[in-house]
Amino acid sequence: MDSNTVSSFQVDCFLWHVRKRFADQKLGDAPFLDRLRRDQKSLRGRASTLGLDIETATRAGKQIVERILEEESNEALKMTIASVPASRYLTDMTLEEMSRDWFMLMPKQKVAGSLCIRMDQAIMEKSIILKANFSVIFDRLETLILLRAFTEEGAIVGEISPLHSLPGHTDEDVKNAVGVLIGGLEWNGNTVRVSENLQRFAWRSRNENERPSLPPKQKREVAGTIRSEV
């Protein structure tokens, strides 16, 4: 096993521990708590893949971080912070909407890269809106936290979420996943809209109805594949 992989995991475990202590003191805001929960699942998946104990890794990570801080000057720390581009966190959903449990009468699921697409194919002829919480950097979608499809009544009928065992996705990955979800929902006669944030960052082109248009390749494929894909 590569030593950098192990040490990276150890440092991530310790930094998560520090953030958890911060949250336990009721100091974290909603985006902070969202990332904390997401990263916890990711660390558990990585621990299983690497065959490492999280508690032991956390202690080792603490030693690594302490050694770095001992060598770091205040001036170097200021320069490092200033050189890191800041990302923005955009929220369409409340914490309650993100954490709410939901179930499907006719569940369908598709894994697309590191994203999992789920929808309830029992939902027909409804007006649906897609909402998402995600970060943006350099005016591009950086990381999708969670996307959910809601009916006008507030019921959750679809979802796109990162697979924590396969970290990493691009804005194009999200765009394609949204296209698959929209195609699956529309197949059953539903009308789908997306939030303004998604229109701006997940789709660059729109049709005359102000709904994101599918990429040409997906327009050809959705009708023939969505029933088996989603």
Curated annotation (Swiss-Prot):
The short sequence motif called Nuclear localization signal sits at 34-38
Top-rank taxon, per record: Viruses
Give the UniProt keywords, A-Z: Eukaryotic host gene expression shutoff by virus, Host cytoplasm, Host gene expression shutoff by virus, Host mRNA suppression by virus, Host nucleus, Host-virus interaction, Inhibition of host innate immune response by virus, Inhibition of host interferon signaling pathway by virus, Inhibition of host PKR by virus, Inhibition of host pre-mRNA processing by virus, Inhibition of host RIG-I by virus, Inhibition of host RLR pathway by virus, Interferon antiviral system evasion, RNA-binding, Ubl conjugation, Viral immunoevasion
> In the UniProt record, does the keyword Ubl conjugation occur?
yes
Return the annotated region ranges for PABPN1-binding. Answer: 223-230
| Keyword RNA-binding on entry | yes
Compositionally biased residues, Basic and acidic residues: 218-230
What is the protein name given in its UniProt record? Non-structural protein 1
